[in-house]
Structures are given as C-alpha cells and as structure tokens.
Amino acid sequence: MYLNLYKIDIPKKIKRLYFYNPDMEPKLFARNLSRVNNFKFQDSNDLVWIEIPDIDFQITPKNVFQYKVEKEEIIKEEEDKKLFVKTLYKYIKKLFLDNDFYFKKGNNFISNSEVFSLDSNENVNAHLTYKIKIHNISNEYYLSILPKFTFLSKEPALESAIKSGYLYNIKSGKSFPYISGLDGILKIDIGNNQIVEVAYPENYLFNFTTRDAEKYGFSKEVHEIYKNKVFEGFKKIPKTLGFLNKITNLNENYQLKDGYKIFINVIYKFKNGESRYAKDVFKYSFYKNEQPLKAIFFFSSKKQFFEVQKSLKELFHNKHSVFYRAAAELGFSKVEFLRDSKTKSSAFLYNPEEFTVKNTEFINQIEDNVMAIVLLDKYIGNIDPLVRNFPDNLILQPILKEKLEDIKPFIIKSYVYKMGNFIPECKPFILKKMEDKEKNLYIGIDLSHDTYARKTNLCIAAVDNTGDILYIGKHKNLELNEKMNLDILEKEYIKAFEKYIEKFNVSPENVFILRDGRFIEDIEIIKNFISYNDTKYTLVEVNKNTNINSYDDLKEWIIKLDENTYIYYPKTFLNQKGVEVKILENNTDYTIEEIIEQIYLLTRVAHSTPYTNYKLPYPLHIANKVALTDYEWKLYIPY
C-alpha cells in the first residue's frame, strides 16, 4: 500500500554560518544574499548569518566566502527541534523556487510548467500544486507530498477577462483581497483598512475558489480534474520533484507495519433490522418514530404558487409519490399539511426581501415540530436573514423553485429523512458499537478566526453516545487569539457536563475532549477542571486537513502512524481526504485504539442525509459549523 510519506535522510543537525562585510550595511547584505539564494539570511548590527541543513549547500556568489568569519555553530536536532524543522522547511522552499515553482502560503508549491487551460473557461489555468509537510513519526522525520490543483487567471490581473475576490502574488506567495483595477492601476487590501496601489501588477494573478468556479461555469471540470488527475500527480512525484532527492529518496515508499491498517465494521441498528449502510433506514425504518409529519408551505407570491402548483401536488399531495412512500418507510404515522382555520389553505406567503411571514396570528399558534417548506425563487448566497427572521416555532426546510421540476428520488428521500432528524421524538438509528457507551460525554471545541476583523469565535458542542445533542455554546467576537480563553472554556464545559446529568441523572464516567487543531493552551489547567468529580478524560487533537494520503482507496480505513497518532479516511462523495487524530492525554480505562474507534464512530452517529457521512466527529462537526456561521447552521444542526 502506498502512502505519500518519504523519510528525510539527512543528518539531524543545523549549521550556522556567519559573515561580516565591512563595506555594506548588514541588512542590505542579508537582503541581497537572500534574494540570489532563495533562502533567508539574518542580520544583526554587524553580522549576517544563515542556518542551513548539514548537507552540501551551495551559497552564491562564491566570493561571499571572503566575508565568512571563523565562527561556526552546529545545533543538534535534540537541542532545538523547532529550529531543525523550520530550517528544513526553508530549504525545501528554496529547492522548489530554484526549480520554477511558485510558493503559496501553507507550504503549497505551484508548478509553472505542469499547467493547462480549462476547457470550460479558457481564462483559467489549472496548475499542478504540491503541498508539503514535515512529520515526526516515532522519532524519525518524514516528508508528505500531496498533489492538488490551484486555479489562477491565465493573464495578469489587469489583463484578465474574469475576476475573483482575491489576488495571488507569484513573487511573495501572499494573497490579498482585490479592490479595483481601473485605468491600469491595481489596488489591493493589505489589512487594517489599508488599500494600496500595486507597484508591479504583472506579478498578480486572480486566484479562483470553488464559489468562483460555480460563478464562471467551471465547477464540474474542477471536480473531474480532481477525480482523474490527482492520481497522475502522485505518479509524477519521483520525476517532477527529483530535486527533493537531496533530502529523501522519492523511489522508496513508506512501509506500513503489520496491524497498522484498521477497519471498523460500522453496524446501524434500525427498528426492524441492522445494516452496514445508513441508507437502509428506508428498508428497516427509523429506530424510534411513530410521529406525525406536519408541514406548512410558504410562497414568495401568489404568482410563484401558481407556477409550482402542479409540481407540488405531484410531490406532496399524491399519496403514491416518493415523498409519501419515504415518510411511510421511515415510520411516520401520517403526513399532515396544516391549514389556516379561516381560509382552509395550507399555502402562506412570506416577504422575499425581508423573509418575514404575512399571517403571524395563525403561525404563532403553531406548536413545535412543524416543517416550514419555503419555496425560494433563487439561490441565496447569505441565508442568515431567512433563518433569523422566520418564526422560531417552525423548522425551516427551504427548497429552490427551479429544483422542483426534476428533483431526484434520493433527494426527496433525504428531505424526508432530514425532517425526521429535526423531530426530538424521532431517532433514525443507533450504532451497535456505541450502544454501551452511554456513560461517555463527547465534546468538540472549535476556534474560528477573522484575521481581517481581528476577532475570534469559540464554540463548544456536546453529544452523547447516540448522537443526541446535549449542549451548544458560542462566544462571538472575542479578541483575536490562537489560544482559547480557559475561563470561558471552563464555564462552557460545566454547562455541557450539567446537560449530561440533566438527561441521564448521573455524571459521565468518561469525557472525550476533541479540539480542532492543537492544544496550545496550558493543558494542566484544562485537566484540572475536566477531572471534576473524579471524571476520567481524554484530550484529543484533530487535524481535519492532514497532508498524508494515497492513490489507493483508503476510504473507511484507519491508519496507525505511531502509538498516539492515527489517520482515518471517511467515506464521502468528495475526494479522499484523511483526518489526523492525536491522543494527547488518556486518563480513561480505554486503550488508545478503543478511543480511536469511538472517535471514528462519532463521524457516523448522525447523518444529515442517509447518503452522506460527516468528515469530522459529530461534536466537532457541530462546533465547526456553529463557529463559522451566525444562523445558517440552524438549517443543518437539529438543536
């Protein structure tokens, strides 16, 4: 089996060389040397120095060595691990820049030769890109090399026929918000409300996102490129990146030890049977249901109502339709469309500009668990106003008008499933392997940052072993900080803990704390308050963007890297991507592998539809969604 890991085979030490040029300012001397060597030189009041790997490193120009001083230092890796890794990254960057690659933030290297124009939009070029990361696995260093694609404008910004929100500087590797490009003057936002004119506009290309791809009609081709060409990117590594053989051997693949590839057999328990597949819920029925499915329709105008009337009748009033069959298969006792007692109509109007309803007297009397089927005239980029302004006693289920004409059966079935997800008395399934884990509390923590506004949002979400959401807490617009505010975290943790007690009438025996990213806080403080009442705990770091992957199909497999670090590959419709999990602390009676199994199962304790899986463990998925949006998350998270 292939993994994109290559052992770094160089001495584990760094050389520091010093230079003194009496005829030039150290800052200017360092800047010139950095430019010609594609490697950063540092300076002080009198000296210039460079930290390099202990290998054959060619510094140019040759006459620079007349300024070299005798002082030379060797720093071993065990003396300064951070310096060793940092220097390796700098050297790898130099190798790429020396070989006609662009650098992009995040150790992405964009090929200037492996590039082609898109068939669906000739103004866009697809550049083969390699993302690089250094890993320490069992005290050995490895390089992961992940092929991907970057979509840039074919022409420089001022000449490009299409535009996007961001510009990429091919020299600095940085991206900036695009402001304008009038009269041959390119303006960008460099942050802190500073808008500047660009001195060298020829160095700026538009960088296109997935949203841009939808806007300009090349999203389908992007998907095809990732589906068909990433494999080629892996195969090209030994030849295209041969210059990396200075630090590794690209012809030697990482060897996975016996027993380090793990498969978890996930079994869903439904009312009338068991299956490995969530979609079999339509075969075996909801684990718990027998509720009526109540709904009410909202239209933007009478004109819209008459335009979709035929489609709606076929879908929602035909007792033999997919909608009715799906409701019966999931165990709903009946389907009921609420009608105004005065007008006898189940059709209501809303204001499409403000998203407010027009018959508030009747609407306000409606009890909980009623679906609001809202017909939208067009795609809404920001759906927050709809969620914010609609009555809280309704469960929003919006549908695009244009989708009604040829809505596919599996989408209708997913729609009915989603409705059931939002009814507290319904339970689609339970996982067989999680059935006996009711004494565990699972908590996800996410920090999202707005560097432009210099604000941070903190979110915590807690679920039980069946995926029931016990608590969600969010703190918005905190001062920008990579570290969590531990006072806030402690208060939120106590609330989640109390919600567990409220449901089960007993304290949890084990608490799983899953952090999106690394714990850079003082974990002794965290351990102190989560061990309240002698609760056992585990602290888990989750990296949702691991660089380790393969051209082999690893979906539904777990890879063990070392005793505390694993990668699982969820089965999704999208391209194969792994999630790296590191057990930082284990104070429970579970083994590390048993903890990893539960973390993986948390990706399956709930489904937004029975045809898709979550990439992240459910409490972390919730925290991630809630932290990033103000209201939109309420459309997807049943809380």
UniProtKB/Swiss-Prot annotation:
It comes from the Bacteria. One of its GO terms (cellular component) is cytoplasm. This is Protein argonaute. Residues 1-100 are annotated as: N-terminal domain. Mn(2+) 1 binds at residues 446, 516. SMART domains: Piwi. Induction: Expressed at low levels (at protein level). Probably part of a cas1-cas2-ago operon. The active site is at 446, 482, 516, 624. Residues 101-153 are annotated as: Linker L1.
